[in-house]
Every structure is written in C-alpha cells, then in structure tokens.
C-alpha cells in the first residue's frame, strides 16, 4: 500500500496582491496522530508563472500535479502560448468532477500571473471552484489562518507585504493546529518570475513574530 495516500493535514495560504500572488504552506504531513513528514512539499509549479498548493491526501495531490503539468505543457506546444489560470482551473475542475464517485481527497489553490493579471482560484474535492480576489486559506489550520488574513489584508498590498502576511497567518495557525507545523514554504509569482523564497529568510521573519 502506498503510504503517501494516507499522509494528510495541512494549512495553505494564497494572497492576491497588486503586483502578483503569494502562495505559502507549512510542511508537516500526518498519518492520524503520527507526524509522518516534516518536509512535505505542498507547493508545485504547474507552468512558468503558475503554482498550486495542496491540502489533503498527498498521493492524490501528486497524481493531480503530474496530470495537470503535462496538460499545461501540451497546451503550450499546440498553441504556442501559456494556458490561462482560469483554463488550468477548468481542467482541474473537470478532472475532479469526473472522479466524484471516487473523489480525490484534496483542496487546491491555483495561483499565478497571466495575460489577465494576478489571480487565485480555490477548488474542492468535487471540482467546485471559486475565484479568490483577496486572501484565502485551505486545510485543517485554515480557521486560525483566516483570523489573521481577515484582520490584516488590504487591497493595495504588494507581494512584499503579502509574504509577511502569509508567514504571520501560517505561524499563528501552526500554534493551534496539530496537523500543521515545522517549516514554512513560500512562493512569490509576479509577471516576471516564479520564485521560491530562501528557507532561512523565511525563518528569520518567523523569529520576529515570537
């Protein structure tokens, strides 16, 4: 049996900013009350300027990443342009909806920058999707994260400010949610680049919150 199928628990955050988007997750994966991994990857690059966060079953999430990454590359080869974030979301929504009788146990955030500007979409396990215009959180620690996001988010926020807010939201969620913990992984996407922040720089920002 594939143990990845049973690795669960997470908190993810997505923030829409004026100049891009910020995606962030903690890195703990659990099997019941057991901490199965302290370095679980939960942010995946889907296209040049598109990322996806995953909450739920790691095995299901990795299957989705493999499929949608290939679909994105095929679209670019055929059309000579990148698929839009809305297009990726529609593909994922159809895939998840098609599995509704044997659902893939995931919550996803798709975020990035395309010709229409910065955008983030959230998807549930049955394929329902919502365009998020502000800040969003998924996973077991999301109630705690939302408390910070709702209090501190502003519509004129830049990605620099968004990074600080995402780290603060996850830092607080990890204090109360046993399925969330360890390090924080942060990705910043602007019209120019997809960048994963240095873990040491993220840790220094967390130390200022203690």
Swiss-Prot record:
Family annotation (Pfam families): Proteasome
Name of this protein: Proteasome subunit beta
Biological processes per GO annotation: proteasomal protein catabolic process
UniProt EC number: 3.4.25.1
Role description: Component of the proteasome core, a large protease complex with broad specificity involved in protein degradation.
Residues the record marks as active site: 10
Keyword Hydrolase applies: yes
Regulation acting on activity, per entry: The formation of the proteasomal ATPase PAN-20S proteasome complex, via the docking of the C-termini of PAN into the intersubunit pockets in the alpha-rings, triggers opening of the gate for substrate entry. Interconversion between the open-gate and close-gate conformations leads to a dynamic regulation of the 20S proteasome proteolysis activity.
Gene3D superfamilies: Glutamine Phosphoribosylpyrophosphate, subunit 1, domain 1
Prosegment residue ranges: 1-9
Principal subcellular localisation of the protein: cytoplasm
Family stated for the protein in its record: Belongs to the peptidase T1B family.
Localization of this protein: Cytoplasm
Reactions accelerated catalytically: Cleavage of peptide bonds with very broad specificity
Assembly and oligomerization: The 20S proteasome core is composed of 14 alpha and 14 beta subunits that assemble into four stacked heptameric rings, resulting in a barrel-shaped structure. The two inner rings, each composed of seven catalytic beta subunits, are sandwiched by two outer rings, each composed of seven alpha subunits. The catalytic chamber with the active sites is on the inside of the barrel. Has a gated structure, the ends of the cylinder being occluded by the N-termini of the alpha-subunits. Is capped at one or both ends by the proteasome regulatory ATPase, PAN.
Provenance organism: Methanococcoides burtonii (strain DSM 6242 / NBRC 107633 / OCM 468 / ACE-M)
GO CC term, one of those recorded: proteasome core complex, beta-subunit complex
Record keywords: Autocatalytic cleavage, Cytoplasm, Hydrolase, Protease, Proteasome, Threonine protease, Zymogen
GO molecular function, one term: threonine-type endopeptidase activity
């Amino acid at each position: 049996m594939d143990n990845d199928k049973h690795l669960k628990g997470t908190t993810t955050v997505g923030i829409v900013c004026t100049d891009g988007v910020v995606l962030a997750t903690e890195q703990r994966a659990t099997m019941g009350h057991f901490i199965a991994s302290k370095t679980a990857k939960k942010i995946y690059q889907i296209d040049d300027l598109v990322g996806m966060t995953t909450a739920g079953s790691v095995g299901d999430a990795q299957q989705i990443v493999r499929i949608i990454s290939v679909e994105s590359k095929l679209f670019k080869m055929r059309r000579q342009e990148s698929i839009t974030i809305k297009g990726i979301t529609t593909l994922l929504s159809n895939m998840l909806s098609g599995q509704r009788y044997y659902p893939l146990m995931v919550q996803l955030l798709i975020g990035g920058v395309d010709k229409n500007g910065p955008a983030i979409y959230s998807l549930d396990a049955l394929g329902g999707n919502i365009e998020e215009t502000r800040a969003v959180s998924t996973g077991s620690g999301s109630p705690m994260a939302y408390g910070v996001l709702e209090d501190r988010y502003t519509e004129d926020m830049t990605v620099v400010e968004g990074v600080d807010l995402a780290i603060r939201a996850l830092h607080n969620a990890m204090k109360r949610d046993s399925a969330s913990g360890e390090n924080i992984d942060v990705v910043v996407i602007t019209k120019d680049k997809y960048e994963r922040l240095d873990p040491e720089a993220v840790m220094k920002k967390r130390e200022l919150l203690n």
